From Swiss-Prot:
It is an enzyme of class 2 (transferase). Belongs to the methyltransferase superfamily. RsmJ family. GO terms for cellular component: cytoplasm. This is Ribosomal RNA small subunit methyltransferase J. InterPro entries: 16SrRNA_methylTrfase_J, SAM-dependent_MTases_sf. The gene is rsmJ. One of its GO terms (molecular function) is rRNA (guanine-N2-)-methyltransferase activity. Keywords: Cytoplasm, Methyltransferase, rRNA processing, S-adenosyl-L-methionine, Transferase. It is found in: Cytoplasm. Coiled coil: none annotated. S-adenosyl-L-methionine binds at residues 107-108, 123-124, 159-160, 177. Specifically methylates the guanosine in position 1516 of 16S rRNA. HAMAP family: 16SrRNA_methyltr_J.
Length: 259
């Protein structure tokens, strides 16, 4: 399920030390108990949840590939006609392998996996990686999606700056979605994304991802950006696919060939 390209650095987190399962999760990811930590990890209904302690009214963050919005998108989201599918080159007879170099909560990776791609998620934040692994655990156990999830989705813990170079495998597409400051004040930004951004911070080194991504990808690199953001590392893409609020910048290295 999970590989690590680096030893996880110790990160402070609050959790109930009377629960051995929580203790084991935190030990695995190098998360040390800190009674003054801003964030708390809890288990709710067999699900690892991250709460922001100074904003108890906010809904906790967790990874759920089985139900909710992600499952709805899998069933009704437009299939291979979605912008992200077009961006990575999914088409008749072409199902590329993908490295998601900035996995986050795994939603885009899951969409691509549900459309047939083998996806390796790379996540450097140990708290987010713990949430992802827990989401994968529950997805792998699900009778509906478990079989293909086990085949198509895996997690690598490490910084993409080094992990992309260390993967040592051939991959068609590298997908990047660096954290970028939101300027609008939507409900999503106010709640879930605000919590997430306060945990992981801005990807200040995001420009440094393009070169290793281009070195690893055999076919193309796809960068998801807000519509108002500048090009990653100032490099103009070969083409763009635009949506209502975002765009996918596509850097082409070679043509996609049918299987």
């Amino acid at each position: 399920m999970t590989a690590s390209s680096t030893q996880p650095a110790s990160v402070g987190i609050f959790f109930n030390r009377q629960y051995p399962t929580l203790e084991a999760v935190c030990d695995r990811w190098g998360l040390v108990f800190d009674e003054n930590a801003l964030f708390e990890l809890v288990f709710e209904d067999n699900c690892l949840v991250l709460n922001k302690r100074d904003e108890p009214k906010l809904k906790g963050i967790f990874v759920d590939f089985v139900s909710g919005a992600v499952a709805h998108r899998r069933k009704f989201g437009g299939g291979r006609g979605q912008a992200i599918a077009k961006a990575v080159g999914l088409k008749q007879g072409v199902t590329p392998s993908v490295v998601d170099g900035t996995a986050g909560l795994g939603r885009d990776a899951f969409v691509l996996a549900s459309l047939g791609c083998n996806v390796t998620m790379v996540e450097r934040n140990p708290v987010v990686a713990a949430l992802l692994e827990d989401g994968l655990r529950r997805a792998y156990e699900d009778a509906d999606i478990g079989p293909w999830m086990q085949e198509r989705m895996r997690l690598v813990h490490g910084s993409s700056l080094t992990a992309l170079a260390e993967l040592g495998e051939q991959v068609d597409v590298v997908y990047l979605d660096p954290m970028y400051p939101h300027r609008e004040k939507s409900a999503l930004v106010k709640k879930e994304m605000r919590v997430f951004q306060s945990l992981v911070g801005a990807d200040l080194d995001a420009d440094g991802l393009l070169a290793p991504a281009m070195a690893l990808a055999s076919k193309r690199v796809v960068v998801k950006r807000p519509d108002y953001a500048e090009d990653l590392d100032g490099v103009k893409p070969n083409t763009r696919i635009e949506t209502k609020k975002n765009r996918f910048d596509v850097y082409v290295k070679a043509a996609m060939k049918s299987e």
